[in-house]
Amino acid sequence: MAERSTLARPYARAVFELAGDDATERQAWSRRLAAVAEVVQVPQLASLLTHPRISAEQLAGIVCEAAGDLGQTGENFVRLLASNRRLQYAPEVARVYEELRAEAEGIVDVEVLSATQLEDAQQERLAEALRKRLGREVRLQTRVDESLIGGAMIRAGDTTIDGSVKGKLARLSSALVH
Protein backbone atom coordinates (compact mmCIF):
# COMPACT_ATOMS: atom_id res chain seq x y z
CA MET A 1 0.00 0.00 0.00
CA ALA A 2 2.82 2.40 0.84
CA GLU A 3 4.42 1.81 -2.56
CA ARG A 4 1.11 2.46 -4.32
CA SER A 5 0.67 5.65 -2.35
CA THR A 6 4.22 6.76 -3.14
CA LEU A 7 3.70 6.18 -6.85
CA ALA A 8 0.27 7.83 -6.87
CA ARG A 9 1.15 10.95 -4.86
CA PRO A 10 2.98 12.90 -7.62
CA TYR A 11 0.07 12.37 -10.01
CA ALA A 12 -2.47 13.40 -7.39
CA ARG A 13 -0.46 16.52 -6.53
CA ALA A 14 -0.15 17.46 -10.20
CA VAL A 15 -3.90 17.17 -10.70
CA PHE A 16 -4.55 19.09 -7.50
CA GLU A 17 -2.26 21.92 -8.63
CA LEU A 18 -3.89 21.88 -12.06
CA ALA A 19 -7.33 22.26 -10.46
CA GLY A 20 -6.07 25.24 -8.46
CA ASP A 21 -8.37 27.10 -6.07
CA ASP A 22 -11.43 26.76 -8.30
CA ALA A 23 -14.02 24.70 -6.38
CA THR A 24 -15.83 23.75 -9.60
CA GLU A 25 -12.62 22.49 -11.18
CA ARG A 26 -11.71 20.58 -8.01
CA GLN A 27 -15.11 18.90 -8.08
CA ALA A 28 -14.74 18.10 -11.78
CA TRP A 29 -11.38 16.43 -11.12
CA SER A 30 -12.91 14.45 -8.24
CA ARG A 31 -15.54 13.15 -10.66
CA ARG A 32 -12.98 12.39 -13.40
CA LEU A 33 -10.61 10.57 -11.08
CA ALA A 34 -13.44 8.57 -9.50
CA ALA A 35 -14.66 7.52 -12.96
CA VAL A 36 -11.19 6.40 -14.07
CA ALA A 37 -10.61 4.61 -10.75
CA GLU A 38 -13.90 2.76 -11.11
CA VAL A 39 -13.12 1.70 -14.68
CA VAL A 40 -9.64 0.34 -13.97
CA GLN A 41 -11.01 -1.79 -11.13
CA VAL A 42 -13.34 -3.71 -13.44
CA PRO A 43 -11.85 -7.24 -13.33
CA GLN A 44 -11.89 -7.74 -17.12
CA LEU A 45 -9.95 -4.51 -17.64
CA ALA A 46 -7.66 -4.83 -14.63
CA SER A 47 -5.93 -7.83 -16.19
CA LEU A 48 -5.17 -5.80 -19.34
CA LEU A 49 -3.50 -2.91 -17.50
CA THR A 50 -0.16 -4.67 -17.17
CA HIS A 51 -0.38 -6.79 -20.32
CA PRO A 52 2.80 -6.18 -22.34
CA ARG A 53 1.14 -6.59 -25.77
CA ILE A 54 -1.44 -3.87 -25.25
CA SER A 55 -0.10 -0.44 -26.08
CA ALA A 56 -0.47 2.53 -23.78
CA GLU A 57 -2.57 4.29 -26.43
CA GLN A 58 -4.94 1.32 -26.66
CA LEU A 59 -5.30 1.21 -22.88
CA ALA A 60 -5.92 4.95 -22.70
CA GLY A 61 -8.57 4.69 -25.40
CA ILE A 62 -10.38 1.86 -23.63
CA VAL A 63 -10.31 3.63 -20.25
CA CYS A 64 -11.37 7.01 -21.69
CA GLU A 65 -14.29 5.47 -23.56
CA ALA A 66 -15.46 3.44 -20.56
CA ALA A 67 -15.08 6.35 -18.13
CA GLY A 68 -17.32 8.62 -20.17
CA ASP A 69 -16.89 12.37 -20.54
CA LEU A 70 -13.50 13.18 -19.03
CA GLY A 71 -12.87 16.27 -21.11
CA GLN A 72 -9.60 16.90 -22.91
CA THR A 73 -7.53 17.40 -19.74
CA GLY A 74 -8.96 14.23 -18.19
CA GLU A 75 -8.18 12.22 -21.31
CA ASN A 76 -4.66 13.67 -21.39
CA PHE A 77 -4.22 12.59 -17.78
CA VAL A 78 -5.34 9.05 -18.63
CA ARG A 79 -2.86 9.00 -21.53
CA LEU A 80 -0.10 10.12 -19.17
CA LEU A 81 -0.91 7.35 -16.69
CA ALA A 82 -1.10 4.82 -19.54
CA SER A 83 2.19 5.90 -21.12
CA ASN A 84 3.91 5.53 -17.74
CA ARG A 85 2.14 2.18 -17.13
CA ARG A 86 0.48 3.58 -14.02
CA LEU A 87 -3.23 3.17 -14.84
CA GLN A 88 -3.56 0.50 -12.14
CA TYR A 89 -2.75 3.22 -9.60
CA ALA A 90 -5.75 5.38 -10.57
CA PRO A 91 -7.77 4.41 -7.45
CA GLU A 92 -4.87 5.44 -5.23
CA VAL A 93 -4.40 8.68 -7.21
CA ALA A 94 -8.09 9.45 -6.62
CA ARG A 95 -7.78 8.69 -2.91
CA VAL A 96 -4.68 10.87 -2.44
CA TYR A 97 -6.28 13.66 -4.48
CA GLU A 98 -9.34 13.59 -2.20
CA GLU A 99 -7.05 13.81 0.85
CA LEU A 100 -5.29 16.85 -0.63
CA ARG A 101 -8.60 18.44 -1.52
CA ALA A 102 -10.08 17.84 1.94
CA GLU A 103 -6.99 19.29 3.61
CA ALA A 104 -7.06 22.39 1.40
CA GLU A 105 -10.77 22.88 2.04
CA GLY A 106 -10.36 22.44 5.80
CA ILE A 107 -12.25 19.16 5.97
CA VAL A 108 -11.24 16.08 7.91
CA ASP A 109 -12.72 12.64 7.26
CA VAL A 110 -13.70 10.94 10.49
CA GLU A 111 -14.54 7.26 10.75
CA VAL A 112 -16.83 6.35 13.63
CA LEU A 113 -17.24 2.70 14.59
CA SER A 114 -20.02 2.16 17.09
CA ALA A 115 -21.54 -0.90 18.70
CA THR A 116 -25.01 0.18 17.55
CA GLN A 117 -26.33 2.44 14.81
CA LEU A 118 -26.00 6.11 15.80
CA GLU A 119 -29.13 8.23 15.57
CA ASP A 120 -29.02 11.42 13.49
CA ALA A 121 -29.00 13.61 16.60
CA GLN A 122 -26.06 11.65 18.04
CA GLN A 123 -24.15 12.03 14.78
CA GLU A 124 -24.79 15.79 14.74
CA ARG A 125 -23.61 16.21 18.35
CA LEU A 126 -20.53 14.10 17.67
CA ALA A 127 -19.71 16.05 14.50
CA GLU A 128 -20.05 19.36 16.38
CA ALA A 129 -17.81 18.18 19.22
CA LEU A 130 -15.20 16.96 16.74
CA ARG A 131 -15.38 20.26 14.82
CA LYS A 132 -14.54 22.10 18.03
CA ARG A 133 -11.76 19.69 19.00
CA LEU A 134 -10.14 19.46 15.56
CA GLY A 135 -10.81 23.02 14.43
CA ARG A 136 -11.95 21.85 11.00
CA GLU A 137 -15.08 20.80 9.17
CA VAL A 138 -15.87 17.15 9.77
CA ARG A 139 -17.14 14.58 7.28
CA LEU A 140 -18.48 11.63 9.32
CA GLN A 141 -18.50 8.09 8.04
CA THR A 142 -20.26 5.76 10.46
CA ARG A 143 -20.20 1.98 10.64
CA VAL A 144 -21.56 -0.53 13.12
CA ASP A 145 -19.11 -2.96 14.72
CA GLU A 146 -20.91 -5.10 17.28
CA SER A 147 -17.59 -6.50 18.55
CA LEU A 148 -17.05 -3.16 20.34
CA ILE A 149 -19.75 -4.32 22.82
CA GLY A 150 -20.70 -0.71 23.60
CA GLY A 151 -19.46 2.83 22.99
CA ALA A 152 -17.53 3.93 19.92
CA MET A 153 -14.11 4.22 18.33
CA ILE A 154 -13.29 7.39 16.39
CA ARG A 155 -10.49 7.76 13.83
CA ALA A 156 -9.55 11.14 12.37
CA GLY A 157 -6.29 11.07 10.44
CA ASP A 158 -3.59 9.88 12.84
CA THR A 159 -5.80 10.38 15.90
CA THR A 160 -7.77 7.50 17.40
CA ILE A 161 -10.17 7.90 20.31
CA ASP A 162 -11.25 4.56 21.73
CA GLY A 163 -14.32 4.93 23.91
CA SER A 164 -15.54 1.40 23.31
CA VAL A 165 -16.27 -1.13 26.03
CA LYS A 166 -13.98 -3.57 24.22
CA GLY A 167 -11.13 -1.02 24.37
CA LYS A 168 -11.77 -0.27 28.04
CA LEU A 169 -11.76 -3.98 28.88
CA ALA A 170 -8.48 -4.43 26.98
CA ARG A 171 -6.88 -1.52 28.87
CA LEU A 172 -8.18 -2.86 32.20
CA SER A 173 -6.87 -6.34 31.41
CA SER A 174 -3.48 -4.90 30.46
CA ALA A 175 -3.33 -2.87 33.68
CA LEU A 176 -4.17 -5.92 35.79
CA VAL A 177 -1.51 -8.05 34.10
CA HIS A 178 1.22 -5.46 34.56
UniProtKB/Swiss-Prot annotation:
Keyword Protein biosynthesis included in the entry's annotation: no
Main location: membrane
Coiled-coil residue spans: none
Cited Pfam families: OSCP
UniProt entry tagged with the keyword Ion transport: yes
Topology of this chain in the membrane: Peripheral membrane protein
SUPFAM superfamilies linked to this entry: N-terminal domain of the delta subunit of the F1F0-ATP synthase (SSF47928)
Cellular component, GO annotation: plasma membrane; proton-transporting ATP synthase complex
GO MF annotation list: proton-transporting ATP synthase activity, rotational mechanism
Localization per record: Cell inner membrane
Assigned keywords, A-Z: ATP synthesis, Cell inner membrane, Cell membrane, CF(1), Hydrogen ion transport, Ion transport, Membrane, Transport
Cross-referenced InterPro entries: ATP_synth_OSCP/delta_N_sf (IPR026015), ATPase_OSCP/d_CS (IPR020781), ATPase_OSCP/dsu (IPR000711)
UniProt subunit comment: F-type ATPases have 2 components, F(1) - the catalytic core - and F(0) - the membrane proton channel. F(1) has five subunits: alpha(3), beta(3), gamma(1), delta(1), epsilon(1). F(0) has three main subunits: a(1), b(2) and c(10-14). The alpha and beta chains form an alternating ring which encloses part of the gamma chain. F(1) is attached to F(0) by a central stalk formed by the gamma and epsilon chains, while a peripheral stalk is formed by the delta and b chains.
Family: Belongs to the ATPase delta chain family.
Function: F(1)F(0) ATP synthase produces ATP from ADP in the presence of a proton or sodium gradient. F-type ATPases consist of two structural domains, F(1) containing the extramembraneous catalytic core and F(0) containing the membrane proton channel, linked together by a central stalk and a peripheral stalk. During catalysis, ATP synthesis in the catalytic domain of F(1) is coupled via a rotary mechanism of the central stalk subunits to proton translocation. This protein is part of the stalk that links CF(0) to CF(1). It either transmits conformational changes from CF(0) to CF(1) or is implicated in proton conduction.
Record NCBIfam families: ATP_synt_delta, PRK05758.2-2
Protein name (Swiss-Prot/TrEMBL): ATP synthase subunit delta
Native organism taxonomy: Bacteria, Pseudomonadati, Pseudomonadota, Gammaproteobacteria, Chromatiales
